[in-house]
């Protein structure tokens, strides 16, 4: 009965809260039953909470029910009525036990769980269901208590759904603890509380909650009452009362303090459970209790933050918390174990990472610094900053407290941060790697024992990330590790950094597949594997680092020799030489790395293999120390900013190397996606930043180096020879190119010999072509012909071979200026067809800028310079290529024209150098034609030339070119014999020497604009042979406006790139040199061609032309391709010389329709020397054109705004022209005239286009006007019919009205006219509205002409930009 009274008193305290709900709900039912004596008899004893005779059993599901389900329900705001048994006396519920046969409450369930009353989870769940069912049975459905029970039940079911599916039995640990703790009423609960709280590290905060709740009112009395009855009471009753007072306490970290009402009693028991709890584990742990208390205070924050972790995962949270309890004891035990076993776990590391135990004294200083750094890492992991996720690792796992009996079987080498810290303080670690292996062992244990999705695993990953980040930033000094692989300091630290992530991943993978028996060996294997990987990465990095300073090999040999002779002097000399030689080392680096886009990496890999110079590290200390300081020197903000800008300048293929550098040196970014990496310079190590800086500057230096080289050749051949090997190669190549022309038969062989030279030169300039021709860069064919031919210096100095259009130096310069962004569709077209004699200088040389020339606007000539060559289609295969494009075939003379200008177009001429040249490769075009007369046509390379021409001379130059179309063949009659190839180079040199001095060296750049123009002219001539005729006189004055500029451009072009044809003709008549005017000049209507050049072609030359006509399939496709480009690649169009001009698409189809133009060959007629040839009338459409288009072409309405667009660089060109020309005045005149002609033609084309457009617009307007007229006529017809109907109806109405008037004679006369006039007025109004609407439509229709609007806008924009 005392128990009952105790219960009653206890329940009174809580019933004060419950009266409001339960009392109110049940008072109506219970009022009649008032007899008090009956109440105590009805008050049945509380349910049994222990089974002393039955063995206790604990399962994971029961543990979950206690620590997660019950804990969550207990905290719910509606839980208070269910926390204690129903007090029928207090609530006056005499019939309660009649209706409810098995009362149940959460307090009882809690006691039963704590006392291991349940055999399995199902029994406990049954008790919960009983409690809810009792509430629903006894109370009315709408009562508040029922609603509260429903809310609790919903939460209960939700938590049950998350319960582990399989029930596994756990060892029962706490019997003894409870027995000892009976001295205090709360003892039975305290062990549980300490276990739970230690699991969450809440035990530390357990001391605090009791202190705060003391302020809670009125609850101290219940504890007093509880204490009085407790001695006589049985176990169950003892356990029961504390449940009420202390249940809140056990969850104190989570429950608000007002719920922890009766905790005044708690402070005293807390130490006791802790005391006996260690006693159970190890009696020696008593002294550590005080320290535990201290630590608790430090950890008060963690329980609250990680509350949910413990709720959701009671077991997992426990493994870490126990560390809080017996930290030092278990630490002491584990430490001896670890001492015996650590060497095993670390065996792989010492041999790998410390193979040289001899110089320990030196290492000690360095490792001491590293170990100090490691001690700082440990301190940081113990700091509050990381406490939220580091706390489970502070102390060893308390196996007994947590009931983890299989822990020692699975984890053979336990480890925790406390043990690591003690070992660090005791100097047990010899180096940083030992320390790192222990830390990683701790994490791997965690991953192995816990499931991958466990909270503790997540916390371990976070903490490991922190550790790896800090460890990666360990100072680079302890680079003793590099000893196995010498020299590069940055190598070793990175590998050590890299290991951690793999170990964590390896261990986490182990965790999923761990076996009790072989776990130890697996762990050791994983560690060994990780360390081997680390070493391998270190070796790779060092190889990469060593591969860059390749030229150190000779240095090392010299050092060894010096060592033998002068050991002391050697160091000084080495330091001196190291500084001196580092720049050369870098140069080779460049050649290695830069060697063509992607190949750069391949080039780097081989050097390490060949690098046998490991013995050299001994002398290198001075240099390496300096290099180390340089590498590790921190970067300023400005340097970082500059570095980021430089990285952004790099082409795509170089960025891959940047990512590799970062990932190899930054472990945190090692596993990041290489395609997309975010770089934060603040987090990168100084050594990484320095390495990036070194690489980026080397790349950019190579990028700029080509321009320097471009200037170098301008000073002369001798200078080129003397300065750099690459330039000497280019100069030798120039000689070979010249000799190639003289001796075409030997060219193929020498090509093959010269592969390496060309390749090396290609590799020097990959940066300029990263996107353009990476595959060709790797191609071997395209040799420098240096070996067999005399160097250019052997030629007379007065013949600057560098100016030769085929000269390799020009090619070289062009290569250096290749734009990286050449459109691929242009690139692809030129690949398969470049003339072999040009191919020998494979990478076309884009024009180099001359100092004296103004800066050139972007134009196709610059773009077309570096057309990429497809490796799949080498020139050797090019001859068969032409057939696929037969429909493009222009007249046979096309080949002829193009040949004239092949050599005048450096950017295109030198496009591709793959494959041996055809037998007559080096010969000028007319000689090649003679060869062709005896050979089947295989001139596909020339096709490529034309393709390149197409690229450069796209749309903008189309118009002027057309006017020039039909005169090229007349200008250059083929020579009578195929002999005399040799004088060509000399003649070209002399010719260039005679040209104005300002221009010579800058051939590459200066010509940029003219070549495209000439080529297009040629192509258009070939495409429109039927258009030959006289130029419309109305256009002559337009052309004259541009004479000065054209004159300059063509003269410049003429000086720099006399075409091979011109060169040959210079020597043609009698072998004496002769000034050959530019092809444009010869076609100029105002300047008569030279008499010697205009005499009719010899029959020999004519016949080759005819045969060429049959055989030039290769060339024939070209013009069409160009035309198509003009139509389809507008992106290139604006870059033309005259941006305002646009191609005229209507002409293309008709021109290309058929080979009808091929037969007439009107352009082969001999020319009179004195009579200027007038260019064909541009306005005349091709023969195939429909009449409509002919009419459109006839009117030429010049548009003023576009005239000025051509004269952008007038001043600069004029400046070039004003220089005193060395050539005879006739040549100057001819060039000026040809330029004038060119300008005139360009203007005419522009005007013709405008006229065509204007005509089209007029035709459109006429069509619209006709439509309007038609609609108007239709409206008129409709109106007439309508009017006829209306008149008929009106007459009928009038007749009816008259009849009515007669019938209704009594009505006044006035209304009748009004009635008859009314419909007439309506009709008139309708007609008036219709007419207004029609006129409005008519007025509005012509007001908006979109074509006219766009034309106006275009004119405005052109004026704006001109």
Curated annotation (Swiss-Prot):
Bias type Polar residues, positions: 926-941, 1224-1234
Keywords: Bromodomain, Chromatin regulator, Chromosome, Nucleus, Repeat, Transcription, Transcription regulation
Feature: compositional bias, Low complexity: 504-516, 722-737, 953-963, 977-1006, 1014-1028, 1041-1050, 1308-1319
Domain spans labelled NET: 623-707
CDD domains xref list: Bromo_Brdt_I_like (cd05497), Bromo_Brdt_II_like (cd05498)
Residue spans of biased composition, Basic residues class: 553-568, 750-766, 893-905
UniProt keyword annotation of ATP-binding present: no
Domain Bromo: 57-163, 365-474
Positions of region (BID region): 542-597
Compositionally biased tracts (Pro residues): 34-49, 219-234, 348-358, 481-503, 606-621, 772-793, 871-889, 1086-1099
Protein name from the UniProt record: Bromodomain-containing protein 4B
Organism field: Xenopus laevis (African clawed frog)
Gene name for this UniProt entry: brd4-b
